[in-house]
Amino acid sequence: MEQVINEMNMNKEIDKPFSVSLSFNDHMRDLGEAVMNTRVVRALDIAAASYPIHRQVRCAARRPMEQVFDDLALKSGLAAQRLYAGSLLLDGPGVFVQVNGYRKLTYCSCTFKLWARDIALAEATIAKLFRVVGDDRVRSQLFVVEWRMRDRDGDAASATFEEVADDVLVDEAYPMLAEPVDQFIDRYVQAPESVLILLGPPGTGKTRLVRAILGAMSRRKGDSAEVLYTADKQVLRSDSIFVDFVTGSHDAFVIEDADYLLQSRTDGNADLHRFLMVADGVVRTEGRKLLFTTNVPNAGAIDEALLRPGRCFAAVTVRRLTRDEGHRLALRLCDGDAARASRVLASAMRTDQRTVSAAEVYQAMRQPPQPVAQSMPPRVRATA
């Protein structure tokens, strides 16, 4: 009798309409997935799964985000529900799309999460949405950064955003490499070794080189590389970020300002062992990369275990440029205009300086040209 009563109660629960409550707060970006989950449960309840295909694609456009989302809402041919400026739900027969957008300085990025009844409909919908975004769509590959940090209360926090992989590096900015910079990047991306350490003072081009590497990884992957990023010492002292990298889908782990993390373990470094396990393949991370940037002046201060062959691809000191190297960089950026290159270099460094950073040269390039002073004709003294 008790079993029969329990079964009757279970049947009553099944007959109840499915409902879900939502908190409209900072998690509004997840509303599309909540709606989709509701539909999935209903479909399973009647044994009719309607959305077996899932795709996630990204793009960027060099126009205001509001314009892009207005066009997606009005011109996609799908029923649209705008949640706020950068969040949109699109719905049609056999297809459902959640769109999230982010503003950048010179472009906006969009992430499309799409569910469809079949592959053909999914591909056709993606192509239609890209056409709506229009000719302003950035053709460069994107990479996705998951930034881990601590908030003002000391609690773990994160932010995820897309970056356009359009960084163009010139060899003249990296004379310390024994090969063209693109060749160096390609060798690292394809190498079995996971670790790359970039040493040097701020402004020498370490971050620019990291971005170019992530762009190359995206192009090689044929999709957006997923990057775990932090510069927070406290975050790295927790096991969770390492567990997420090992068990997740990230293609690279970038640790900036990692001075304390790279010092010798005999000097009290208790955090390096986690990276050694990942870099050594104790846990499987084939094809994934560990990139460190540090202000440590030379590799002699780094724990030797991290530099071991087979584990470390290279430890590169990205230094400041000599005056001659700075002039060659300026000349390259000025397309061979020697007069302009001399003005750029003069703006980037004082006459008593021996070195200049690549950042100082790039900054001088962005400054408007100074007008050339016009010489005044000599004054003629009037005579009686």
Predicted segments — roles?
Residues E2-V97:
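Short Lys/Arg-enriched alpha/beta "domain-start" segment
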Residues L83, Q98-G101, A314-A384:
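C-terminal alpha-helical "lid" subdomain
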Residues D135-A178:
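Charged, amphipathic alpha-helical linker segments immediately N-terminal to NTP-binding catalytic cores
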Residues L177-E179, S218-S249, G268-N269:
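Short glycine-rich substrate-engagement loop in P-loop NTPases that contacts/grips substrate
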Residues L177-Q190:
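Pre-Walker A adenine-sensing motif
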Residues E193-V210:
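Walker A/P-loop nucleotide-binding motif
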Residues K233-L261, L272-V282:
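Conserved alpha-helical scaffold flanking the Walker A/P-loop in AAA+ ATPase domains
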Residues D259-T293, P297-R308:
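Conserved catalytic/switch belt of AAA+ P-loop NTPases
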